[in-house]
Curated annotation (Swiss-Prot):
It comes from the Eukaryota. Belongs to the phosphatase 2A regulatory subunit A family. Scaffolding molecule which may coordinate the assembly of the catalytic subunit and a variable regulatory B subunit. Component of the Sca1 complex, a regulator of cell motility, chemotaxis and signal relay. The Sca1 complex is recruited to the plasma membrane in a chemoattractant- and F-actin-dependent manner and is enriched at the leading edge of chemotaxing cells where it regulates F-actin dynamics and signal relay by controlling the activation of rasC and the downstream target of rapamycin complex 2 (TORC2)-Akt/protein kinase B (PKB) pathway. It is found in: Cytoplasm, Cytosol; Cell membrane. InterPro entries: ARM-like, ARM-type_fold, HEAT, HEAT_type_2, PP2A/SF3B1-like_HEAT, PP2A_Regulatory_Subunit_A. GO terms for molecular function: myosin phosphatase activity; protein phosphatase regulator activity; structural molecule activity. HEAT repeats lie at residues 7-45, 46-84, 86-123, 168-206, 207-239, 240-278, 279-317, 318-356, 358-395, 397-434, 441-479, 480-512, 513-551, 553-584. Component of the Sca1 complex composed of at least gefA, gefH, scaA, phr, and the protein phosphatase 2A subunits pppA and pho2B. This is Protein phosphatase 2A scaffold subunit.
């Protein structure tokens, strides 16, 4: 067995790392493998090639998968430490073994490292060492090696000579017809990227038949990978070739007996439409899309619903209204809440496509329906995209039609829905104007300050800050601050706490005059609150506002209050008061 001579090493830390390669503790071995570059640098290129790499090949390759994953990755980073690209072939033997490992993640990392090396090594080394490795993996008895081989063709083909290119295509074809589904899946996964490296005539004569074979495989796990290849191959072919070779597979896959294959068509529909082109999409793919929107499986309808806006953007408005809109109307009341939630994610994006008049005519009632859905995620998804609609139909029309529903959702039993409404309020306020806001939404913003959920109260205080930035300090001084400060005497201490949070948040935008005239007097009252939590939060609030106040006010009005808090019997109050005093 290969070993590493450490007797003559002057680098004590490196000796320790080398010893840790043999340690029984897996964490120590992992630590050493992660520092393989440091070990190799200390040993030098020659000893790394003649001692370290053989040792790793003989000893470490029997290790735990966790170690092998890291080793597979690190070996690909050793090219410069073995003497550069001309010596990188010494890294191939251990990586070939790792490429045949049982654990998928180990194999994937080994293939990544092999691809990295394949791009670096000289042509002579590539032909004499790398290609034989690829052919060896392709013909290995154990399927794991053959699956790894599938990931090496794309990087190998551009560097091979004409004769070897022919052999590579033939070998890849054999893997596409392998007896093992796992190998065929690996071949299908890599077929598209491999095809991009191949000459157009060879793609048509050799790759397309392989694609059609994989797309009609008895295993649905193989067939669904063929859908992705439809998009990749379609982008390489002409319209006529797509109609002849690719379109039949897309249509067949959209009607496949396995819902997983149909799901993949729905998932990749945007890419399929783009690769096929607008004309084929309009004449051939829309029918398939409509069937997917009406699929018996909720998972397929969900995925298809997410693609509605993408597909509609490729069609004329008339075609949208005639073919897609009826499906959308059905999906609004779909039995699956996940389908409705998916639709709610994208339906607002239809407004710019439809335009103002058709949005009001065809879509507005659907928005309202979804805003009142029983499932909170549906309501949430609609709220988060309201701005897309307001840009199209105008804020006045939005406020007339959707505002009542928005106000209703502001008191929704799901706190996440209330939170989404709060986040949307500043944008809505800037569009509605101050008078409309004060009349319709002003009281609502104050209600949130007393919400039982902390996240809502916190968001509500930040909301007030944003509204002050929109409407100005004078508005806040007259409309918001008096209401916020009035909560300081509320019997529930959480409301009193909200007053303090609001002061801290608003103080950064209202200016020193408002702080000294309105906020400091209130804090002076709250210094004597009976709840210690309130008192130490008063001290924390002072920490926020002291930098914003004139020094004379700090010395004459704030410091005496902090001195009083520093004499408090509660240790937390004393602590935060002492911190605030340091700022005085």
């Amino acid at each position: 067995m290969a070993s590493i001579n450490t007797e003559s090493d002057d680098y004590h830390p490196i000796v320790i790392l080398i010893d840790e390669l043999k340690n029984e503790d897996i964490q120590l071995r992992l630590n050493s493998i992660k520092k393989l570059q440091s070990i190799a640098k200390a040993l030098g290129p020659e000893r790394t090639r003649t001692e370290l790499i053989p040792y790793l090949q003989d000893s470490v390759l029997e290790d735990e998968d966790e170690v092998l994953v890291v080793l597979s990755e690190e070996l690909g980073n050793l090219i410069e430490f073995v003497g550069g690209a001309e010596h990188a072939v010494c890294l191939l033997p251990p990586l070939q073994i790792l490429a045949g490992a049982e654990e998928l993640v180990v194999r994937e990392k080994a293939v990544e490292s092999l691809c990295k090396i394949a791009k670096e090594i000289p042509t002579s080394s590539f032909e004499e060492s790398f290609l034989p490795l690829l052919f060896s993996l392709s013909k290995a008895d154990w399927f794991t090696s053959r699956t790894s081989a599938c990931g090496l063709f794309t990087v190998s083909y551009p560097r091979a000579n004409a004769e070897m290119k022919k052999s590579l295509r033939k070998t890849f074809g054999g893997l596409c017809h392998d007896d093992t589904p796992m190998v065929k899946r690996a071949a299908a996964t890599n077929l598209g990227s491999f095809a991009k490296q191949i000459e157009k005539e060879s793609v048509k004569s050799e790759i397309l038949p392989l694609f059609q074979s994989l797309s009609t495989d008895e295993q649905d796990s193989v067939r669904l990978l063929g859908v992705e290849n439809c998009a990749l191959l379609g982008s390489m072919l002409t319209n006529e070739e797509n109609i002849q070779f690719i379109l039949p597979t897309i249509k067949a896959s959209s009607l496949d007996k396995s819902w997983r294959v149909r799901y993949m068509v729905a998932r990749l529909l945007k890419e399929l439409c783009e690769s096929m082109g607008t004309e084929i999409t309009k004449t051939e793919l829309i029918g398939a899309f409509v069937k997917l929107l009406k699929d018996t499986e909720a998972e397929v309808r969900t995925e298809a619903s997410l693609r509605i806006a993408d597909v509609c953007s490729l069609l004329t408005k008339e075609m949208n209204i005639k073919t897609i809109l009826p499906c959308v109307k059905d999906l609004v009341s779909d039995s699956s809440q996940h389908v409705r939630a998916a639709l709610a994610q994208v339906i607002m994006s239809l407004a710019p496509i439809y335009g103002k008049e058709d949005t009001l005519t065809h879509l507005l009632e659907l928005f309202l329906h979804l805003l009142k859905d029983d499932f909170p995620d549906v309501r949430l998804n609609i709220i988060s995209k309201l701005d897309q609609v307001s840009k199209v139909i105008g804020i006045e029309m939005l406020s007339q039609s959707l505002l009542p529903a928005i106000v209703e959702l502001a008191e929704d039993h799901q706190w996440r829905v209330r939170l989404a409404i709060i986040d949307y309020i500043p944008l809505l306020a800037s569009q509605l104007g101050v008078e409309f806001f004060d009349e319709k939404l002003g009281n609502l913003c104050m209600t949130w300050l007393g919400d039982p959920v902390f996240s809502i109260r916190e968001a509500a205080t930040n909301n007030l800050k944003k509204l002050t930035e929109v409407f100005g300090v004078d508005w806040a001084k007259n409309n918001i601050i008096p209401k916020v400060l009035s909560l300081h005497s509320h019997p529930n201490y959480l409301y009193r706490m909200t007053t303090l949070f609001s002061i801290s948040t608003l103080s950064t935008v209202v200016g020193g005059d408002v702080i000294s005239s309105s906020m400091v007097p209130l804090l002076a009252k709250m210094v004597s609150d009976k709840v210690p939590n309130i008192r130490f939060n008063v001290a924390k609030t002072f920490q926020t506002i002291i930098p914003l106040l004139d020094s004379t006010i700090v010395q004459s009005r704030v410091k005496p209050l902090l001195v009083k808090l520093h004499e408090d019997t509660d240790k937390d109050v004393k602590f935060y008061a002492s911190q605030a005093l340091q700022l005085c």
